[in-house]
């Protein structure tokens, strides 16, 4: 959806938008998701959902952009640019070829919706929802230092470990992605 330039300019002048940026700077995003949802619903027909999702992306909260976009998709309004974020993924880790970015990103979206601080009730952590035991094992295999705190604080670290693990499964199952995916217990 193309958003009117004047609407976009007025959107970014709003106090709530300034508050979202301030909360991001202060690393205090407890209320950010609620503010973004409010902003998304202000004027849907003119593009408030797109602007709210873009704002979430601007502050690197892809998880919030996905949530806004998902809600819109239930009403047949599709904002795929924000519903399926694209971030950098490795090509090789310790000489192991990593699957293409689209595969890694689809796993991240399914597992955590791009929430870097995600913690599951089972104990899985970060973007790729790595279990601590798996992360320790993979870190050793990849010649990386294991750090439990980095699983939720360092997205690149989490993606590197998870990608290395997935690449190993694909090798183990002779390149069969579907079989590898069904054996995925990050």
Model-predicted regions and their roles:
Residues 1-178:
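Cell-wall glycan-active module
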Residues 182-186:
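Conserved small/polar residues in nucleotide/adenosyl-binding loops
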């Amino acid at each position: 959806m193309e958003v009117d330039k004047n609407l976009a300019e007025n959107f970014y002048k709003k106090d709530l938008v300034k508050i979202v940026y301030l909360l991001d700077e202060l690393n205090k995003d407890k209320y950010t998701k609620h503010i973004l949802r409010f902003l998304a619903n202000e004027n849907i027909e003119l593009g408030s959902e797109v602007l709210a999702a873009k704002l979430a992306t601007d502050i690197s909260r892809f998880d919030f952009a996905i949530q806004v976009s998902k809600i819109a998709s239930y009403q047949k309004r599709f904002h795929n640019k924000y519903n399926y974020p694209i971030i950098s993924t490795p090509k090789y880790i310790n000489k192991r070829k990593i699957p293409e970015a689209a595969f890694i990103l689809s796993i991240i979206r399914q597992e955590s919706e791009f929430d870097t601080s995600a913690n599951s009730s089972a104990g899985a952590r970060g973007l790729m929802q790595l279990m601590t035991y798996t992360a320790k094992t993979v870190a050793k295999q990849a010649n990386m230092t294991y750090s439990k705190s980095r699983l939720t604080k360092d997205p690149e670290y989490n993606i590197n470990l998870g990608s290395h693990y997935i690449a190993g499964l694909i090798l183990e199952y002779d390149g069969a992605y579907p079989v590898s995916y069904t054996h995925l217990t990050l």
